[in-house]
Amino acid sequence: MIVARAHHIGTTGGEERGMEVGVGLPTTTPGADGRCLLEWARRAEEGPFASLGVLDRMLYRSVEPFAALSAAAAVTTRVRLVTMVVIGPLRNTVLLAKQAASLDLLSGGRLTLGLAIGARADDYQALGVDQAGRGRRLGEQLAELRSIWEKAEVGPEPVQPGGPPLLAGGMSGEAFARMARSADGYVHGGGPPRAFAGAAAKAWAAWRDLERPGRPQLWGQGYFALGDADPGSAYLRDYYAFTGPFASRIAAGNLTSGRAVKDFVRGYQEAGCDQLVLLPTVSDPAQLDRLADVLA
């Protein structure tokens, strides 16, 4: 089984380790209601998946990520819950710390908090937040979150000592430096394995530049809709419409066959990924069974 931590020599870190595969909740896809999200969470818990991930978007027909993961926490006990990613600078840091600590408590210590700055100007405008300086603000947030949790200034106290693991995303030099300074690992925004490999190498380099002990967690993501290519790709073109023509390139990366999924997973394994979260582009819970069969 691909998800069962098949060991390999990581190309970015030079050490032997395995990769787990998680799955996303369809919080942004058409047709997903509360019942659908709970069914996804239950099936993921029963299947071979290591985590449940969610996206974050303000001006879209999407479910708020902490609400979605709280619902998932209520019907699961095993899978890790991860934000892929929450747009940190859109949120008050104290409130964000409380939301994350609350979810960590409710889930029994299963939250991994991925944060990034986002690229959609309309989300910032909707909340009256200045997009300028958002990278600096995220860097401050990463440090402040740890301080808030460690000092127990805002309850509840997280189950995980020091708070949930923090992942930071982004592709600029400062984004990698920010990750190495204040996070526990790096979360990649998606794309083919070669793109992840390049980003992972930069994450490792930033980590080593600061002479941090241990190693960064490396998380990746991709999109899939097995047997449902047309609606899945249409969703991606809509979701990424703000990127213009690039949206069609993203849609072309939708994994719609078993062979495509296997090749994608293998590529991320070889690139040194620790956990790959496959995000659905259609909301049918039967997708989980199809994906589990492919990964078996």
Question: Predicted segment positions?
Answer:
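Active-site-adjacent structural elements that line small-molecule/cofactor binding pockets in enzymes
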Residues: 1-296
